[in-house]
Amino acid sequence: MTTESEVATSATAAREKLDAHTYETVQWHFHESTGSPFWLEKKAGLNFDPLTEVKCFDDLKKFPLFEDEWLRGGPVRRWVPKGMDGQPTYVFETGGTTGIPKSRVVIDDFRIDYEMFSHTLPDEYFPKGANWLMLGPSGPRRLRLAVEHLCQFRGGISFCIDLDPRWVVKLIKKGWMDHLEEYKKHCIDQAVTILTAGHDIKCMFTTPKLLESLAYGLAERDTSIQEVGITGIFSGGTEFTPQWTRFCVEELLGGPTEESGVY
């Protein structure tokens, strides 16, 4: 049984680790030799010196609030730290439904995040070496590359469909629901074609709504998610309630919740 003193000791150690990480991060981003042009320019307008006056997590309160609008437009290279010059750089974007999309510069974080995530996946449902289907947004999206890397990190090959979420939003705004339904069918048709082409795909990522549509699309062809060989499903991106999870597992996948490969 954990004692009160052990909890206090753990909390103190965690706090010290957080403070050290904060200090290291601020030193990196605001130092002339490693910082990005954006943060070095912001540093000049601050009424304090981040390099000498930010020593712990609480000191971050000295900074003004971050403004989302800073992420719209370019030049996007202003976000690349000098300490990362020369490394392959990716740009991921938001939906862009309210004007210029917000951009995010990424070098390695999606790889790091999903390699850590990989260690949480049960091999029983997500076997090492298995091929994956990415049934989700394509284009300048972090998620697509992240799932692809997750699959590759686990020794598999990732198959993707073309899905433009910006077009989906436009169809909804215009009230073109018939067009929306046809576009959804177009996306599901791509997925069904891949799953029934003999690629030995066992795992997939998709959103809850697309997962449901895929199940119905396969049923129309007299097959099912289980019959095409899927054993593990990583799903997210939109609301995923306990009630829907139960419906998905028991009705769409045909199994009890406690034995499901839905993650």
Walk through the language-model features, giving the residues of each.
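Nucleotide 5′-phosphate-binding alpha/beta core
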Residues: 1-93, 99-131, 136-140, 144, ...
